[in-house]
């Protein structure tokens, strides 16, 4: 694994197509291309736009956005693996299997996002992913992605 923080926001913007308010990864703490694994971080603040309606009296991060943050962290690793191809191809989130939500994520929490790929091919990939607050698992599941040519989306 590399020293932390390996990838900060400016470089993340080159690896992910997402932008505010939908960019849900703040930095990459470590990654290992040989092991196909990554650890990233999302600082959850009260200023997140989703807290306006989810839920004003007791704000918690929507579970689907925790899963999206995991998918984005995994997407960063795919971007690093694709390196020369990433300007031509896009990783699309295909599905989530065995998703479990175990703990609420609240303003002020630091969400640690971990993913390890069991498969990366020219067509896509599969990864096991886990989001934690401290040592407590908040959500986990198996993610699948398709790699498509950006031109095919026009």
From Swiss-Prot:
GO terms for molecular function: (3R)-hydroxyacyl-[acyl-carrier-protein] dehydratase activity. Its main location: cytoplasm. GO terms for cellular component: cytoplasm; membrane. It is found in: Cytoplasm. Its EC number is 4.2.1.59. Keywords: Cytoplasm, Lipid A biosynthesis, Lipid biosynthesis, Lipid metabolism, Lyase. It is an enzyme of class 4 (lyase). It catalyses: a (3R)-hydroxyacyl-[ACP] = a (2E)-enoyl-[ACP] + H2O. GO terms for biological process: fatty acid biosynthetic process; lipid A biosynthetic process. The active site is at 54. PANTHER family: 3-HYDROXYACYL-[ACYL-CARRIER-PROTEIN] DEHYDRATASE. Belongs to the thioester dehydratase family. FabZ subfamily. Involved in unsaturated fatty acids biosynthesis. Catalyzes the dehydration of short chain beta-hydroxyacyl-ACPs and long chain saturated and unsaturated beta-hydroxyacyl-ACPs. This is 3-hydroxyacyl-[acyl-carrier-protein] dehydratase FabZ. It comes from Chlamydia abortus (strain DSM 27085 / S26/3). The gene is fabZ.
């Amino acid at each position: 694994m590399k020293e932390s923080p390996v990838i900060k926001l400016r470089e993340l913007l080159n690896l992910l197509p997402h932008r505010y308010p939908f960019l849900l990864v703040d930095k990459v703490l470590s990654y290992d291309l040989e092991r196909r694994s990554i650890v990233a971080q999302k600082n959850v603040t009260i200023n997140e736009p989703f807290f306006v309606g989810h839920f004003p009296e007791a704000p918690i991060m929507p579970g689907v956005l925790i899963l999206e943050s995991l998918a984005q962290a995994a997407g960063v690793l795919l971007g690093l693996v694709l390196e020369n191809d990433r300007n031509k191809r896009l990783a699309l989130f295909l599905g989530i299997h065995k998703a479990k939500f175990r703990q609420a994520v609240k303003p002020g929490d630091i969400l640690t996002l971990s993913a390890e790929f069991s498969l990366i091919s020219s067509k896509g990939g599969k990864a096991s992913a886990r989001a934690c607050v401290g040592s407590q698992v908040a959500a986990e599941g198996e993610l699948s992605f398709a790699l498509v040519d950006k031109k095919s989306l026009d």
